[in-house]
Swiss-Prot record:
NCBIfam families: argB. The gene is argB. It catalyses: N-acetyl-L-glutamate + ATP = N-acetyl-L-glutamyl 5-phosphate + ADP. Pfam families: AA_kinase. Keywords: Amino-acid biosynthesis, Arginine biosynthesis, ATP-binding, Cytoplasm, Kinase, Nucleotide-binding, Transferase. CDD domains: AAK_NAGK-C. GO terms for molecular function: acetylglutamate kinase activity; ATP binding. Its EC number is 2.7.2.8. Pathway: Amino-acid biosynthesis; L-arginine biosynthesis; N(2)-acetyl-L-ornithine from L-glutamate: step 2/4. This is Acetylglutamate kinase. Substrate binds at G68, G69, R90, N194.
Length: 300
């Protein structure tokens, strides 16, 4: 970074320091789930990571959990397979698990870490086996309602987080790093499991007693009508979320996102935010201004 760039950066930080909620992020752990769809566009991806590095420079302690849905789907199709989902969860057989590992650990995570470095931060990629970060258990078969009918579903090599080793994350945060976590866990017998990135972000936020959880997606937030941006719901309580799920307004992949968000709030987080990562500086606007740009969830 040359001297001119450094001066511009200092001026930018000074402006951000005057925003209404700047003090709320200082010293706070902020878990940021970056969705695969929000990271497809290279310019948006770079902007998101730049804002995360800026939060670190403002005194926040960001932790990134990334997905990779579009990239995984593309590779699955390239291998002549068809992506399979039930209730927003990817059904993961042996071949799909190998693709998930290859894409997340080999492509998505290194790309995010390199962008952090490019914007002046220090990133480090992690997965469940890194210092036993994510101990998981295989998801059992369960009854799921599909098209009005209950069916038994075997998700394959899909897991739920059982334990989060927070010490490795806190050590990295204390040393100035931004952890970048791939949602791949291991059970106590060493079997690899595909984890839902939204759920992992929630589990990590709960374990770290994070101040906020932010989910960056390719939608503006929770909307009464997904095709009409004017129906964005800027604030929702737990009761309102449950009602919208029951009515089918919150559906598909948004359900695990909301469920994990509510668990994070019950664990002590002040707020959870669902925002569109394709909006320029959405992360900073949501966390540092009163109005925000997406949907803010609170218990009451």
């Amino acid at each position: 970074m040359d001297n001119t760039s450094k001066v511009h950066k200092l001026m930018e930080l000074a402006e951000l320091a005057r925003l209404p909620r700047r003090k709320e992020v200082e010293g706070a752990v902020i878990v940021i789930k970056v969705g695969g769809h929000a990271m497809v566009d290279p310019a948006a991806r770079s902007s998101i990571i730049k804002d995360i590095v800026t939060l670190r420079e403002l005194g926040a302690l960001p932790v990134i959990v990334h997905g990779g849905g579009p990239e995984i789907d593309a590779m699955v199709k390239r291998m002549g397979m068809t992506p399979s989902f039930v209730a927003g969860i990817r059904v993961t057989d042996d071949e799909t698990l190998e693709i998930v590992r290859m894409v997340l650990v080999g492509n998505v995570s290194p790309d995010i870490v390199s962008l952090i470095m490019r914007h002046g931060g220090k990133g480090v990629g992690l997965l469940g086996s890194s210092g036993s970060l994510l101990i998981a258990r295989k998801k059992p078969m369960e009854k799921v309602k599909v098209d009005g009918k209950e069916i038994m579903v075997d998700y394959g090599w899909v897991g739920d987080t059982e334990q989060v080793n927070t010490s490795i994350l806190m050590d990295l945060l204390d040393k100035g790093y931004i952890p970048v976590i791939s949602p791949i866990g291991y059970d106590r017998d060493g079997h690899c499991l595909n984890l839902n990135a939204d759920t992992v972000a929630g589990d990590i936020a709960s374990a770290l007693k994070a101040g906020s959880l932010v989910s960056l997606t390719d939608v503006n937030g929770v909307m009464m009508d997904p095709s009409d941006k004017s129906t964005l719901l800027s604030h929702l309580t737990e009761k309102e979320c449950e009602d919208l799920i029951e009515r089918g307004i919150i559906s598909r992949g948004m359900i695990p996102k909301i469920r994990s968000s509510l668990c994070v709030l019950k664990a002590g987080a002040h707020s959870v935010h669902i925002i569109n990562g394709n909006i320029e500086h959405a992360l900073l606007l949501e966390l540092l201004t009163e109005k925000g740009v997406g949907t803010r969830l609170t218990l009451k």
